[in-house]
A protein has these predicted regions:
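Secreted/periplasmic carbohydrate-active enzymes, especially glycoside hydrolases
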Residues: 1-139, 161, 176-177, 198-201
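Substrate-binding/catalytic cleft of secreted carbohydrate-active enzymes
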Residues: 106, 110, 116-272
Protein backbone atom coordinates (compact mmCIF):
# COMPACT_ATOMS: atom_id res chain seq x y z
CA UNK A 1 0.00 0.00 0.00
CA UNK A 2 1.08 3.56 -0.75
CA UNK A 3 0.40 6.53 1.47
CA UNK A 4 -2.15 8.88 -0.06
CA UNK A 5 -3.52 12.33 0.68
CA UNK A 6 -7.22 12.90 0.01
CA UNK A 7 -8.78 16.32 -0.44
CA UNK A 8 -12.43 17.28 -0.99
CA UNK A 9 -12.71 20.46 -3.06
CA UNK A 10 -15.58 22.81 -3.88
CA UNK A 11 -14.09 24.40 -6.95
CA UNK A 12 -10.74 25.58 -5.62
CA UNK A 13 -11.92 25.79 -2.00
CA UNK A 14 -10.69 23.05 0.33
CA UNK A 15 -13.59 21.44 2.22
CA UNK A 16 -11.77 18.59 3.99
CA UNK A 17 -8.60 16.54 3.80
CA UNK A 18 -7.10 13.40 5.30
CA UNK A 19 -4.15 11.05 4.99
CA UNK A 20 -4.55 7.35 4.32
CA UNK A 21 -2.17 4.40 4.39
CA UNK A 22 -4.74 1.86 3.21
CA UNK A 23 -7.50 1.37 0.67
CA UNK A 24 -10.25 2.95 2.79
CA UNK A 25 -10.35 6.50 4.10
CA UNK A 26 -13.28 8.20 5.84
CA UNK A 27 -13.63 11.98 5.62
CA UNK A 28 -16.32 14.12 7.25
CA UNK A 29 -17.62 17.06 5.20
CA UNK A 30 -20.18 18.58 7.59
CA UNK A 31 -20.97 21.64 5.44
CA UNK A 32 -21.55 19.76 2.18
CA UNK A 33 -24.56 20.59 0.02
CA UNK A 34 -26.62 17.72 -1.36
CA UNK A 35 -26.83 16.83 -5.03
CA UNK A 36 -30.41 17.16 -6.27
CA UNK A 37 -32.27 17.28 -9.58
CA UNK A 38 -32.92 21.00 -9.06
CA UNK A 39 -29.52 21.87 -7.56
CA UNK A 40 -26.98 19.26 -8.73
CA UNK A 41 -24.07 20.25 -6.50
CA UNK A 42 -20.79 18.55 -7.42
CA UNK A 43 -17.52 18.31 -5.53
CA UNK A 44 -14.07 17.06 -6.49
CA UNK A 45 -12.24 14.27 -4.70
CA UNK A 46 -8.49 14.52 -5.23
CA UNK A 47 -6.27 11.55 -4.37
CA UNK A 48 -2.52 12.17 -4.43
CA UNK A 49 -0.02 9.35 -3.93
CA UNK A 50 3.39 9.97 -2.40
CA UNK A 51 4.88 8.91 -5.76
CA UNK A 52 3.36 12.00 -7.36
CA UNK A 53 0.36 10.43 -9.11
CA UNK A 54 -2.84 12.47 -8.76
CA UNK A 55 -6.42 11.48 -9.65
CA UNK A 56 -9.43 13.81 -9.50
CA UNK A 57 -13.04 12.62 -9.62
CA UNK A 58 -16.29 14.59 -9.57
CA UNK A 59 -18.94 13.30 -7.17
CA UNK A 60 -21.91 14.42 -5.11
CA UNK A 61 -23.60 13.83 -1.76
CA UNK A 62 -27.22 12.60 -1.81
CA UNK A 63 -29.57 10.08 -0.20
CA UNK A 64 -31.65 7.78 -2.40
CA UNK A 65 -34.32 5.23 -1.54
CA UNK A 66 -37.01 3.28 -3.36
CA UNK A 67 -40.05 2.59 -1.20
CA UNK A 68 -43.29 0.83 -2.05
CA UNK A 69 -44.84 4.17 -3.02
CA UNK A 70 -41.98 5.41 -5.18
CA UNK A 71 -38.55 7.03 -5.31
CA UNK A 72 -37.16 9.34 -2.63
CA UNK A 73 -34.24 11.72 -3.16
CA UNK A 74 -32.82 13.35 -0.04
CA UNK A 75 -35.98 12.36 1.84
CA UNK A 76 -38.32 13.94 -0.73
CA UNK A 77 -40.60 11.85 -2.95
CA UNK A 78 -39.76 12.43 -6.62
CA UNK A 79 -41.87 11.16 -9.52
CA UNK A 80 -39.40 9.81 -12.07
CA UNK A 81 -40.33 11.01 -15.55
CA UNK A 82 -37.90 9.94 -18.23
CA UNK A 83 -37.04 8.25 -21.50
CA UNK A 84 -34.93 5.35 -22.74
CA UNK A 85 -31.81 6.44 -24.59
CA UNK A 86 -29.56 4.75 -27.15
CA UNK A 87 -26.26 6.43 -27.98
CA UNK A 88 -26.09 5.60 -31.71
CA UNK A 89 -26.08 8.35 -34.34
CA UNK A 90 -26.45 8.35 -38.16
CA UNK A 91 -23.17 7.90 -40.02
CA UNK A 92 -21.14 7.44 -36.83
CA UNK A 93 -22.85 4.66 -34.88
CA UNK A 94 -21.62 4.51 -31.30
CA UNK A 95 -18.60 6.75 -31.95
CA UNK A 96 -20.44 9.98 -31.11
CA UNK A 97 -18.15 12.74 -29.81
CA UNK A 98 -18.33 14.40 -26.42
CA UNK A 99 -20.39 17.32 -27.72
CA UNK A 100 -23.24 15.08 -28.92
CA UNK A 101 -23.19 12.97 -25.76
CA UNK A 102 -23.59 16.08 -23.62
CA UNK A 103 -26.17 17.58 -25.97
CA UNK A 104 -28.43 14.54 -25.58
CA UNK A 105 -28.45 15.02 -21.81
CA UNK A 106 -29.28 18.70 -22.25
CA UNK A 107 -32.17 17.90 -24.61
CA UNK A 108 -33.60 15.39 -22.14
CA UNK A 109 -33.41 17.82 -19.23
CA UNK A 110 -34.12 21.21 -20.77
CA UNK A 111 -36.22 20.58 -23.89
CA UNK A 112 -38.13 17.41 -22.97
CA UNK A 113 -38.40 18.27 -19.25
CA UNK A 114 -37.29 14.81 -18.12
CA UNK A 115 -35.74 14.20 -14.73
CA UNK A 116 -34.61 10.62 -15.47
CA UNK A 117 -33.08 8.51 -18.23
CA UNK A 118 -32.53 4.80 -18.75
CA UNK A 119 -29.36 3.91 -20.65
CA UNK A 120 -30.92 1.09 -22.61
CA UNK A 121 -29.59 -1.49 -22.66
CA UNK A 122 -25.93 -1.00 -21.82
CA UNK A 123 -23.56 1.41 -20.02
CA UNK A 124 -23.06 4.57 -22.06
CA UNK A 125 -20.44 7.25 -22.56
CA UNK A 126 -18.88 8.79 -19.48
CA UNK A 127 -19.44 12.18 -21.16
CA UNK A 128 -23.19 11.56 -21.16
CA UNK A 129 -23.24 10.47 -17.51
CA UNK A 130 -20.99 13.39 -16.55
CA UNK A 131 -23.55 15.74 -18.06
CA UNK A 132 -26.37 13.96 -16.22
CA UNK A 133 -24.40 14.64 -13.03
CA UNK A 134 -24.03 18.31 -13.95
CA UNK A 135 -27.64 18.88 -15.03
CA UNK A 136 -29.41 16.81 -12.39
CA UNK A 137 -30.74 13.85 -14.41
CA UNK A 138 -31.45 10.58 -12.58
CA UNK A 139 -29.89 7.58 -14.35
CA UNK A 140 -30.89 3.91 -14.48
CA UNK A 141 -28.00 2.03 -16.11
CA UNK A 142 -27.80 -1.71 -16.75
CA UNK A 143 -25.52 -4.48 -17.87
CA UNK A 144 -25.51 -5.02 -21.65
CA UNK A 145 -27.83 -7.54 -23.27
CA UNK A 146 -31.25 -8.05 -24.77
CA UNK A 147 -33.58 -11.06 -24.21
CA UNK A 148 -30.89 -13.76 -24.63
CA UNK A 149 -29.31 -15.75 -21.78
CA UNK A 150 -26.45 -18.02 -22.79
CA UNK A 151 -24.48 -20.88 -21.27
CA UNK A 152 -22.34 -20.79 -18.13
CA UNK A 153 -19.38 -19.19 -19.89
CA UNK A 154 -21.71 -16.49 -21.19
CA UNK A 155 -23.08 -15.91 -17.69
CA UNK A 156 -19.57 -15.53 -16.27
CA UNK A 157 -18.89 -12.84 -18.85
CA UNK A 158 -22.17 -11.10 -18.01
CA UNK A 159 -21.17 -11.06 -14.33
CA UNK A 160 -17.80 -9.58 -15.26
CA UNK A 161 -19.55 -6.93 -17.38
CA UNK A 162 -21.63 -6.02 -14.34
CA UNK A 163 -18.57 -5.74 -12.10
CA UNK A 164 -16.80 -3.50 -14.60
CA UNK A 165 -19.88 -1.30 -14.99
CA UNK A 166 -20.26 -0.69 -11.27
CA UNK A 167 -16.55 -0.04 -10.69
CA UNK A 168 -16.42 2.41 -13.59
CA UNK A 169 -19.62 4.34 -12.86
CA UNK A 170 -20.25 4.19 -9.12
CA UNK A 171 -18.91 7.69 -8.37
CA UNK A 172 -21.65 9.34 -10.45
CA UNK A 173 -24.33 10.83 -8.17
CA UNK A 174 -26.84 10.80 -11.03
CA UNK A 175 -26.88 6.98 -11.12
CA UNK A 176 -29.58 5.82 -8.71
CA UNK A 177 -30.29 2.27 -9.93
CA UNK A 178 -28.21 -0.66 -11.17
CA UNK A 179 -29.85 -2.91 -13.75
CA UNK A 180 -28.74 -6.48 -13.00
CA UNK A 181 -30.99 -8.40 -15.41
CA UNK A 182 -30.59 -8.88 -19.15
CA UNK A 183 -33.27 -6.67 -20.67
CA UNK A 184 -36.55 -8.53 -21.33
CA UNK A 185 -35.10 -11.95 -20.54
CA UNK A 186 -36.92 -14.87 -18.93
CA UNK A 187 -36.53 -15.62 -15.24
CA UNK A 188 -33.30 -17.34 -14.22
CA UNK A 189 -33.25 -17.16 -10.43
CA UNK A 190 -29.81 -18.72 -9.95
CA UNK A 191 -28.16 -16.38 -12.45
CA UNK A 192 -29.92 -13.24 -11.26
CA UNK A 193 -29.26 -14.06 -7.62
CA UNK A 194 -25.57 -13.90 -8.58
CA UNK A 195 -25.83 -10.58 -10.41
CA UNK A 196 -27.90 -9.05 -7.62
CA UNK A 197 -25.36 -10.17 -5.01
CA UNK A 198 -22.46 -8.76 -7.05
CA UNK A 199 -24.12 -5.35 -7.25
CA UNK A 200 -24.89 -5.23 -3.53
CA UNK A 201 -21.36 -6.32 -2.63
CA UNK A 202 -19.62 -3.76 -4.84
CA UNK A 203 -22.05 -0.93 -4.09
CA UNK A 204 -24.40 -1.36 -1.12
CA UNK A 205 -25.44 2.30 -1.42
CA UNK A 206 -27.57 1.78 -4.53
CA UNK A 207 -30.64 -0.41 -5.12
CA UNK A 208 -30.89 -2.95 -7.92
CA UNK A 209 -33.50 -3.66 -10.55
CA UNK A 210 -33.97 -5.56 -13.78
CA UNK A 211 -36.22 -4.89 -16.75
CA UNK A 212 -38.74 -7.54 -17.72
CA UNK A 213 -41.92 -7.77 -19.79
CA UNK A 214 -43.28 -10.66 -17.70
CA UNK A 215 -46.03 -10.04 -15.18
CA UNK A 216 -45.43 -11.38 -11.67
CA UNK A 217 -41.99 -12.74 -12.50
CA UNK A 218 -39.40 -13.54 -9.84
CA UNK A 219 -38.33 -10.44 -7.94
CA UNK A 220 -34.82 -10.83 -6.53
CA UNK A 221 -33.91 -7.16 -6.90
CA UNK A 222 -34.95 -4.10 -4.88
CA UNK A 223 -37.16 -2.56 -7.58
CA UNK A 224 -39.52 -4.27 -10.06
CA UNK A 225 -38.98 -2.72 -13.50
CA UNK A 226 -41.62 -3.61 -16.07
CA UNK A 227 -42.10 -2.88 -19.77
CA UNK A 228 -45.85 -2.27 -20.03
CA UNK A 229 -47.16 -2.42 -23.59
CA UNK A 230 -50.80 -2.92 -22.61
CA UNK A 231 -52.03 0.50 -23.76
CA UNK A 232 -53.97 0.31 -27.04
CA UNK A 233 -55.39 3.80 -27.20
CA UNK A 234 -58.77 2.79 -25.80
CA UNK A 235 -57.78 1.71 -22.28
CA UNK A 236 -56.74 4.12 -19.48
CA UNK A 237 -53.01 3.34 -19.57
CA UNK A 238 -50.56 1.07 -17.78
CA UNK A 239 -51.69 -1.85 -15.66
CA UNK A 240 -52.11 -1.39 -11.90
CA UNK A 241 -49.35 -2.51 -9.59
CA UNK A 242 -51.29 -5.48 -8.19
CA UNK A 243 -51.70 -6.90 -11.70
CA UNK A 244 -47.99 -6.68 -12.47
CA UNK A 245 -46.29 -7.70 -9.22
CA UNK A 246 -46.88 -10.66 -6.92
CA UNK A 247 -45.93 -8.46 -3.96
CA UNK A 248 -46.61 -4.75 -3.61
CA UNK A 249 -44.06 -4.23 -0.82
CA UNK A 250 -41.43 -3.01 -3.29
CA UNK A 251 -41.42 -0.20 -5.83
CA UNK A 252 -42.69 -0.60 -9.39
CA UNK A 253 -40.87 1.25 -12.16
CA UNK A 254 -42.40 1.41 -15.65
CA UNK A 255 -39.25 1.13 -17.75
CA UNK A 256 -41.01 1.21 -21.14
CA UNK A 257 -44.63 1.74 -22.12
CA UNK A 258 -47.01 1.83 -25.10
CA UNK A 259 -44.51 0.54 -27.68
CA UNK A 260 -42.50 1.83 -30.62
CA UNK A 261 -43.81 4.83 -32.53
CA UNK A 262 -42.93 3.06 -35.78
CA UNK A 263 -41.81 -0.46 -36.84
CA UNK A 264 -38.21 -1.26 -35.98
CA UNK A 265 -37.96 -4.71 -37.60
CA UNK A 266 -39.04 -6.21 -40.91
CA UNK A 267 -41.64 -8.40 -39.21
CA UNK A 268 -43.25 -5.58 -37.19
CA UNK A 269 -46.62 -4.25 -38.30
CA UNK A 270 -48.01 -0.75 -37.98
CA UNK A 271 -50.97 -2.03 -35.97
CA UNK A 272 -48.62 -2.97 -33.14
Amino acid sequence: NRNAKLRILDGERLMAEADSAGEVCVIDVPSAERWDIDSPKLYTCEVALETGDVQRVKFGFRDIEFRADGFYLNGRRVFMRGLNRHQSYPYMGYAAPESLQREDARILKEELCCNAVRTSHYPQSQYFIDECDRLGLLVFTELPGWQHIGDERWKEQACENLREMILQYRNHPSIVLWGVRINESVDDDAFYARTNAIAHELDPSRPTSGVRYIQKSSLLEDVYSYNDFSHTGDNPGCKPKHAVMSSRKKALLISEHTGHMYPTKSYDTWSH
